[in-house]
Amino acid sequence: MKRQNEEVKREFTVGFQPIYPAQRLSHHSLNRIIHEPSASKVAYCGFAVDAGTRDELENEQGMAHFVEHLIFKGTAKRKAWHILNRMENVGGDLNAYTNKEETMIYSAFLTEHFGRAFELLTDIVFHSTFPQREIEKETEVIIDEIQSYEDNPSELIFDDFEDLIFRGHPLGRNILGNPGQLKLFRSEDAAAFTSRFYHPGNMVFFVLGNLDFRQVVRWAEKLLADLPAVAGYPSGTRHDWQPGI
């Protein structure tokens, strides 16, 4: 097991190429770019945002996952269906998921469509508008998702176990939130959450594919140069550990 872990660590480190704003991306503060070369014709890229359930305030339970849904529902220049079709039209895929510690927004595509994927990801991650009508729709979608989990004992038992272990700590919360809190969310709440966490200094951009690293950097400089230079990690989002049992 130890040898296997060492191999995984070695393989990851080989593809890890950090970007330091003062040297490369002087107009903003993208925390890292991770580039893993591959000979495959299919490539992947995305943003790993350092924000999950653990970072939610008491009145934001479920917000990290909620925002993950909402970023697909419209930006300043795209409607929801434009977002969904942008990669599907060239045989690509766009997806996301949330866990207790981070949110991943990513795309799979043929290598020649890297620019299209990167531009779309940048648009939804940094320029989502959170229309109130879409919030109301997604609230019902997520409540249905919660109810489906509650009908599945094998899933529910893990939530109960984490609640017991991390009692009183945000890590013990259900990633999906609770119906009562979800119904209170408004557009400005989603905007406030993303303003704290969805900035370059709090995320990593990752690329896997047959792409030159310098090409990736050029695209990053082009697409991210106009973003505000907010550096580092948000304050007040980490919590002292305490045993639940």
Model-found features: residue ranges?
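Extracytoplasmic
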Residues: 20, 40-44, 100-102, 200
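M16/MPP (pitrilysin/insulinase) zinc-metallopeptidase core fold and M16-derived inactive scaffolds
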Residues: 44-108
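Well-ordered beta-strand positions enriched in small/hydrophobic/aromatic, beta-favoring residues
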Residues: 25, 33, 45-47, 105, ...
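His/Glu-based metal-binding/catalytic segments typifying zinc-dependent metallopeptidases
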Residues: 34-39, 46-48, 230-245
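Solvent-exposed coil/turn segments that connect beta secondary-structure elements
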Residues: 38-39, 52, 75-76, 110, ...
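Residues that recognize and position ribonucleotide moieties
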Residues: 23, 64, 183
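N- or domain-start disorder-to-order transition segments that initiate the globular core
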Residues: 2-3, 7-42
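Charge-rich, well-structured scaffold segments of protease-associated domains
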Residues: 2-7, 80-241
